[in-house]
Amino acid sequence: MAFVKTEVQGAVEIITIDRPKALNALNPEVLADLKAAFEAVDQETIRCIVLTGEGDKSFVAGADIGSMSTMTKAEGEAFGKLGNDVFLMIESFPIPVIAAVNGFALGGGNELAMSCDIRICSDNAVFGQPEVGLGITPGFGGTQRLARLVGMGMAKQLVYSALNIKADEAYRIGLVNAVYPQAELMENVLKLAGKIAKNAPIAVRNCKKAINSGISLPIEKAVEVEEKLFGGCFETHDQKEGMACFLSREKPKPKAVFTNN
């Protein structure tokens, strides 16, 4: 993979988009590498993923305008589908994904961050959907995920105006979960990833599935999804071990595999 690098720290994998000279901008090759990186994750041992960009200026500054400038309608639609396919894969990936936003997260960069479960940013981060200023719409889910995260009115304001916002405003409107000084970002992201990784993996996976599946359903159907996933945790090693240790006041030892047994 020419534009993405990976590093494993215990049960946490760090996936880094590595195109700093272009501010980690997305093009078809970067998207293909990102897809390959997620497909290569060892789901038997990894319990949390951290996604970030190389350098201290940019998470992902957007899609590569140079490569888009000559696209036809058909090519533009195909590029949108490529990005959406990759981002949907990340959004539905069984393992939790934290976006460590270390600078610019504009256009496709903001859309990529929004496809992650949790967004934590540095104090120099900048977010926005500037596409209408370039004569296009957001193409990788920006009009959809932004409204779900910050509400329809705020999403429309940001998209229609092409306004960029700083880290503190992104936190205020609920786009990010936390803001840290640049030098402390990865330390705090990895601390959270470690806390997630220590919990029972089957239960964490089922929680992600329940939230993602249920959010678009009527509450009556959504709780049915939760019921099945709740029931699916029983008779697993983690459930037996966790409850036995709770009752005996011992520290539980969640199993490192994701199979129900």
Q: Locations of the language-model features?
A:
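C-terminal alpha-helix plus adjacent terminal tail
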Residues: 1-10, 41-44, 56, 162-168, ...
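Conserved CoA-thioester-binding segment of acyl-CoA-metabolizing enzymes
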Residues: 1-52, 88
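Terminal peptide-recognition signature
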Residues: 15, 19, 33-34, 51, ...
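Charged catalytic carboxylate motif
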Residues: 29-33, 82, 89, 188, ...
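Hydrophobic alpha-helical membrane-association signature
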Residues: 30-33, 79-82, 112, 185, ...
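Crotonase-fold acyl-CoA enzyme core
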Residues: 89-202, 235-236, 241-244, 260
